[in-house]
């Protein structure tokens, strides 16, 4: 189950986070502004975040296999159709809906499956599973950049459509519904979502998402405008992914022995401080340092989000709870990259846009500080089972 989840997330997010490699070719072909082009990625994130509660509920009710298989077909169709668009706004529909739905169908059901199958070492298993996102990020952008340079962006999307569909269908065939003996929730689903702890998680996640997706869209073009080659620019997104693998696996394993909420807060702090490095990054080596630090914090955030939900609320209906939390990412993503693009277009500089992302990331950490008071009592130490 862990291997299937790892591979599924690698395929889904490898496609989604490769968008930065397609950004400049599409910007040039359609003659659009940065904000309008980046909206294609933002819509993708909004769709996968908004569909999280739906795919989580469907997985809880009907099992993950049919949900993941459906996502495979939808993602493949969306990518294939994107290769044929002649207007940018059509990409909002084909790429935004297709890739967004595919990611939603892969991520939440797979995370819920791993959380349900494991009791002991649950956090380690979750950390390994979501490390697939980082591995996909490592591979996706550089592979896309190399393919685009030889085949063009349209043919590359066709290749991605075929590969992602085949991989996700294989993962769907392997995955099985977890046993029914999951840890029961302390409170009812509606009460959990309305609780102060969940509200803090949600607000913090909105703010961090505003910052998080900015480098995935703009870091390659930022590096290119500062003298880096196309491949070296795209490789920065891969470095973020590589560092996030270490963050996901390392912190996921450490959470089995340390306080999961405090590690979660530390991940947000590291992520926030990394934007200060980017703000002072006129040279490629400093950009690499930013990518490494940001990736480590990002990896901890992604790896520990499911663990924090299980820790605070139990694993009963975990897919639905995670889906509800992940809608926050959609709101943040819809604001972050388009706003950054608008600022860059208006000022002709990345500096103010990076500073705005820095401020949003700091705010996300501040919002998370009170979360420690809501740690569960010792009778249900879910994260340490």
Over which residues does each language-model region extend?
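Central cavity-lining transmembrane alpha-helices of secondary-active solute carriers
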Residues: 42-57, 238-250
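Intracellular juxtamembrane helix-capping segments at the cytosolic ends
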Residues: 26, 104-118, 300-313
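Hydrophobic core of transmembrane alpha-helices in multi-pass small-molecule transporters
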Residues: 10, 78, 90-105, 206, ...
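C-terminal transmembrane helical hairpin of 12-TM major facilitator-type secondary transporters
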Residues: 212, 238-244, 249-250, 255-308
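Conserved MFS/SLC helix-loop-helix module at the cytosolic interface between two early adjacent transmembrane helices
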Residues: 50-88, 255-261
